Amino acid sequence: MKRQVALDTETTGKSDDGTPGDHRIIEIGCVEIIDRKITGRHLQVYLDPERPIDEEATKVHGYTWDMLKGKPKFADIAHDFIDFIRGSELLIHNAKFDTSFMDKEFSLMGLTEKTTDIATVTDTVSLARKLHPGHLVNLDNLCNIFGVSNKHRVQHGALLDAELLAEVYLAMTGG
């Protein structure tokens, strides 16, 4: 049995150098795939980032700090999240971005584990560039190339983007 998890995060923003800096995760979305079949099992959590959300980030995903105050903190859900992804192959579009945020959150909790200690990671941006050179490889364009409907995607959302990524990955790698 091969277990994969399409994963996406939404964040409060990013530093000028593209690293998390003092930014935090505000949403995690995961979609389980077993033996190339989307199982219907998923994980979605909204998180209180304990800090304001950059205006540019809000334009991308639509979330404000007021909407997320009172939601669980990352530490509150971390063990359930780790249990969900442990031992799987994570499919992440631009994996360096998401894993850097997850690793930062683990570190803030005092955990020494990195994402790659918990699961293997496949960067679907790199995979798309390898399999389909010359194409734009953002998620919307890949949806168009592979006939995955994304008409309901007005803004980014971690679970929605993970669902789209799961479908794109399966189409991109042979259906």
PLM feature spans:
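Acidic two-metal-ion nuclease catalytic site recognized across multiple nuclease folds
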Residues: 170-175
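Acidic donor-binding loop at a coil-to-helix junction in glycosyltransferase catalytic cores
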Residues: 160
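Conserved non-catalytic scaffold segment of RNase H-like nuclease domains
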Residues: 1-119, 129, 137-155
